[in-house]
Amino acid sequence: MHKTVLLAESAFQLNLKKGDVVVDATLGMGGHTIELAKIVGEKGRVIAIDMDAVAIREAKNRIKKEHKEFLDRIIFVKDNFKNIDKIVAGQGTSAIKVKGVLADLGWRIEQINDPAYGLSFNVDARLNMRLDEAGDSPEDSEDAFDIINSWSADDLERLFRELGEERFSKRIVIAIKEARKEKEIKTTMELANIIEESVGHRGRKGERKIHPATKVFQALRIQVNSELNNLNVFLENALKVLEKDGRLA
């Protein structure tokens, strides 16, 4: 199970007290949410957000088993954290502003290891990479399969270079183009093998412990889930919902 890091430190930075309303913008397995619920007490509320329905279900089950007394203090919301302003306004907490907002950015190990998400080159699965309930996204949204099989060489090269900082992006794209001529690239392992065969670990001084597909997969995950745009919108909207002396951590 994923272990929440810097738990006490993060909660401390928010400077919360009993009765406060606080947002955990990245619920995950609920580690931070539990700590926040403990701090704000019976009269406080924690608005816990996650766009992954699986994460919400698992966090609820964990809290029911381990901290049932906190359930009434937590409001679970399935949504993108970029919509934090609308979420806070629509939860009936009587609070237009909140005392604190906490965001623990990154992927849970459970998501990375789950084939349904198609996130990892260590687990063979369909190229997906959607964070939203392993593919519960609008029908017209692109997943990693769409990008790898339909984007132009120039667009792929730019994606890998800019979002993955992959210095072998041109070589990798040439290999992808050649593979696409034979058949669609459908799985994570197919793509990882194409990348590894095209560049291996050559020239990666100081990077020998990472798989050669790491940076490409990073770029795809960021693109598929609009991570940079979502983060920018979230930061802007988080400031809107904070009290005058509220904190974002």
Predicted features and spans:
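S-adenosyl-L-methionine-dependent methyltransferase catalytic core, i.e., the SAM/SAH-binding region
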Residues: M1-A249
